[in-house]
């Protein structure tokens, strides 16, 4: 069985390999012979073939690696949150068994449909009855990250708020916690996903070294999150004290 950690390590390695490829291409572009780069021998031959400039290819690759970084952020956060919910299910915990933060989040998740355009007072009453019934019946809580996470919108602030809503404190004093970098990665992902910017243009201003430095900080932040949530689960902090 492939575990979360196996998949996380694999995706981290994919990003590192992608960055190595870009550094290799950068090296070939800077190697000159008779005024021509080694890169052009492969991607812009005089005899025909693939006509692709170095800068266009690198910009496309930079956009792709930015998406890969966002994906590992979303994958990690989603799986860490679901690992908490798995513990709640495995231990057959009900509303009265979990901590106050999770209780509050569970109620908010059920009441979320009240804010939908077609919702009315009857919707509000029905959802309140659902909450009351579940509490009185001592039903096991069934929660899933797909219902509690802000889809496609994970940045430093939303990640911090997500974990705090479960009673987990993110290490905001850590050098790896960089909301400015995380929001840039999120915005770039959304712009590419919605087609408002091309892959050639999206990361034009960022160097390969910039992206590599940002990736290192993001990975450091994610690994701190993994450690924090692992301790939270081991200490059963999801339970009511």
Language-model segment annotations:
Residues 1-4, 8-11, 50, 95, ...:
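Intrinsic-disorder-associated interaction segments
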Residues 1-67, 81, 91-101:
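Charged alpha-helical initiation segments
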Residues 2-13, 17-20, 27-38, 160-241:
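Polyanionic, low-complexity intrinsically disordered segments
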Residues 22, 26, 76-80, 84, ...:
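A generic secondary-structure signal for well-formed alpha-helical elements
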Residues 55-74, 175, 182, 204, ...:
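Short, charged/polar micro-motifs that form catalytic or ligand-binding hotspots
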Residues 68-69, 75-173:
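Helix-loop junctions and short alpha-helical segments
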Residues 73-77, 190-193:
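Short alpha-helix boundary/capping elements
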């Amino acid at each position: 069985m492939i575990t979360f950690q196996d998949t996380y390590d694999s995706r981290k390695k994919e990003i590192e390999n992608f960055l190595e490829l870009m550094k290799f291409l950068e090296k070939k572009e800077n190697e000159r012979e008779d005024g021509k780069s080694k890169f052009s021998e492969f991607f812009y031959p005089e005899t025909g073939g693939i006509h692709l400039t170095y800068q266009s290819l690198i910009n496309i690759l930079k956009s792709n690696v930015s998406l890969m970084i966002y994906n590992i952020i979303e994958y990690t956060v989603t799986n860490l949150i679901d690992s908490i919910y798995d513990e709640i299910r495995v231990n057959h915990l009900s509303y009265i068994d979990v901590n106050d933060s999770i209780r509050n989040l569970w109620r908010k998740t059920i009441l979320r449909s009240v804010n939908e355009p077609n919702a009315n007072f009857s919707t509000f009453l029905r959802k309140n009855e659902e909450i009351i019934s579940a509490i009185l019946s001592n039903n096991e809580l069934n929660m899933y990250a797909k219902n509690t996470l802000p889809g496609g919108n994970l940045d430093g602030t939303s990640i911090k708020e997500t974990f705090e809503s479960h009673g987990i404190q993110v290490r905001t004093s850590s050098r790896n916690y960089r909301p400015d970098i995380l929001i840039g990665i999120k915005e770039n992902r959304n712009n590419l996903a919605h087609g408002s910017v091309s892959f050639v243009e999206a990361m034009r201003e960022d160097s390969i070294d910039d992206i590599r430095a940002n990736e290192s900080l993001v990975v450091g932040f994610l690994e701190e999150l993994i450690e924090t949530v692992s301790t939270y689960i081991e200490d059963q902090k999801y339970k009511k004290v």
